[in-house]
Amino acid sequence: MKEGMKMSGFLIGIVTGAVIIYCGILYVRKVEERSFLSYLMERLLFLFVKPLTYSKDEPEKFEQELNKLAKGNDVPITNPKKYIKVDVQEKDVDGMQVFVWNDKKDANQKVILFLHGGAYVLQPSMMHFTLVNKIAQAIDAKVVFPIYPKAPKHKYRETYEKLEKLYRGLLEEHTNTNSIIFMGDSAGGGLSLGFAIYLKELSLPQPKELVLFSPWVDIATDNPEIASYEPFDPILKQSGIHEVAKYWAGEDLKQPLVSPLFGDLSGLGRISIYIGTHDILYPDNRLLHEKLLKEGINHRYIERKKMNHVYVGLPIKEAREDIQELIEELKK
């Protein structure tokens, strides 16, 4: 009798749990208008991610954190082949570590120059390698992945000069620039766009495509609308990235090479922007979209409700849909 009651209680618990989960999924889909997994991922990000923050009362604490990151950045990173399960070559370009894979030695092969995010102070994560590899394998593209110099030890000018040397080498191998794609997320997205402006100033050929995932296009991060979005962003804090921007750019945070929102974007490759509304960079990305519209510049703007910073790198339905759509575009 007792065993039967225990079994009944167990079954009731399972059914109750299933009903609660089902109701939760239904609520998220109907009310939140997003996938359940995207909602769950956001909750987990709030629990486990520690955003970079700055307090005027404790400036030395921020300085210590940056110095700690800088020491780590002095150490070459491990070959990413363990993440992507393909053979990865490692090169040195003017002292800059560069990873290359899926190189068919074909001048007409598509090539992705991927510039990773991390507020210009962090090294790439597994997500960066797996994201670009997924796209590259789908379009049979060569990947060139530089570990560019970062703040606080290095400023943008030094990084641009090293990237220029890398790009000139790419142009020698890929004379058809219609095969070249710049791609980057967050700081790497802003860097991709800023670097394209830099190349235009040098009268160097432009890539065919600029694919920007949640790009940081105004590193001053002083848009008054940001405060309305910060409570919904588990990854970025305005105070932290605004402060770190000074180490990267120096005093002028609004000049176009570091804040491409304020640059002349005519004559560049086609720009594709992917941004979610649970991201403090959303207001500036919307301004970028409006600027491109006003100036009649060909671009693609994909805005996802309630998606987080660089949502395309998360294992969620919305990311899979948008990456697949991007793959189809890049195949053209």
Regions found by a protein language model. Name each.
Residues 1-7, 239, 332:
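Intrinsic disorder/low-complexity segments enriched in polar/small residues
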Residues 3-104:
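A glycine/proline-hinged amphipathic helix-loop "lid/cap" segment
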Residues 23, 27-28, 32, 90, ...:
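Alpha/beta-hydrolase superfamily serine-hydrolase fold, recognizing
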